A protein has these predicted regions:
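Intrinsic-disorder-associated, low-complexity terminal segments enriched in Asp/Asn/His/Tyr and depleted
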Residues: 1-2
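Alpha-helical transmembrane segments of multi-pass small-molecule/ion transporters
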Residues: 5-321
Length: 321
């Protein structure tokens, strides 16, 4: 079975999603709009609350920026015989992305610590300017060098231009985030009116972005979705479990445990897709279809798994500890 899975996943690699300049701009605008929506929910006092309770914040950052990439690397090593190099690199890329924008909505649904959730999403997003290229380079480099000797051929020594990645992340995440915070500060009444609609629109735009990107390869998507589904199911399950386990290990209170579970399990895979679509970062002659499919399906699946966990927790009272 694992041979069938490996060979099937190999067939994804030649898939290349080419956008013209207008298409690329549209996708960049969508991601920037999503991040602007996240920023509208950020209030300066949330950061002071985080500073008063630094333990949960530091544990949350550790869970997302260190534990998740490490657990992902271990999974990639375990799955080495059944997943292709590009699928492995797709998993590593998703783990290197910051927290996803829908995690704040899910945290409020889960009766979790919403201030911690917003603070962590904002922090990991700003830190992503450094941590996304760094985590991808470190764990991806270890994988190519030590885990899968064929990976170097398959990926033609994926030499990522770290500065280009840094610049892209800064423009798409950093700038909209800062603009959103300034907008919310200057126009608080307008912000209250538009915040919820923008966050709902964000999810619709993100799903539309994935559907449009893969519409030409929909038959392939349907043919191999089960293999991709299984890998993302396991990876996302371990991401959620990592958040919960790390929070439990450090004896955080129940509301914070829920926040960390969601923050670690919900990743900004939209950023991953935008990086993959950028020809300056991933040259068009690279066969990285496996990375595209993993990152795209993660973007859909974490909404389903996140809502599942949130609806379960919404019925459970938070334990006071």
């Amino acid at each position: 079975y694992h041979k069938i899975m490996y060979e099937s996943l190999l067939e994804l690699d030649p898939v290349r999603i080419n956008f013209n300049a207008a298409g690329m701009h549209t996708i960049n605008i969508v991601l920037s709009f999503i991040m602007f929506g996240v920023a509208l929910g950020i209030k300066p006092q949330q950061f002071t609350t985080m500073l008063k309770n630094p333990k949960s914040t530091l544990v949350g950052l550790f869970s997302q920026l260190v534990a998740l990439p490490l657990i992902t690397f271990i999974l990639v090593v375990i799955f080495n015989d059944i997943i292709t190099p590009t699928v492995a690199m797709g998993m590593i890329l998703v783990a290197a992305c910051p927290g996803g924008n829908i995690s704040n909505f899910m945290s409020s649904l889960s009766k979790a610590n919403i201030e911690l959730s917003v603070g962590l999403t904002a922090s990991t997003t700003l830190l992503a300017i450094i941590t996304t290229p760094a985590n991808f380079a470190i764990w991806g480099g270890l994988y190519v060098r030590y885990v899968n000797k064929h990976a170097a051929d398959a990926l033609q020594m994926l030499e990522i231009d770290k500065w280009q990645m840094f610049e892209t992340v800064f423009i798409l995440l950093g700038i909209p985030l800062v603009l959103g915070v300034i907008f919310a500060r200057l126009l608080p009444k307008v912000t209250e009116k538009i915040k919820k609609p923008i966050q709902k629109l964000s999810i619709v735009f993100f799903l539309a972005m994935i559907v449009l990107a893969f519409s030409n390869n929909f038959d392939l998507f349907l043919r191999y979705i089960w293999f991709v589904f299984f890998i993302v199911l396991v990876h996302n399950g371990f991401a959620l479990l990592t958040g919960y386990s790390v929070a439990s290990f450090f004896k955080l209170k129940d509301a914070d445990r829920r926040t960390l579970t969601i923050e670690t399990g919900i990743q900004n895979s939209g950023l991953g897709l935008v990086l993959l679509f950028n020809p300056k970062i991933f040259p068009p002659d690279l066969h990285i279809g496996g990375m595209l499919f993993i990152t795209a399906w993660w973007g859909i699946w974490h909404i389903i798994s996140g809502l599942g966990i949130s609806s379960y927790w919404s019925r459970k009272n938070v334990k006071e500890s």
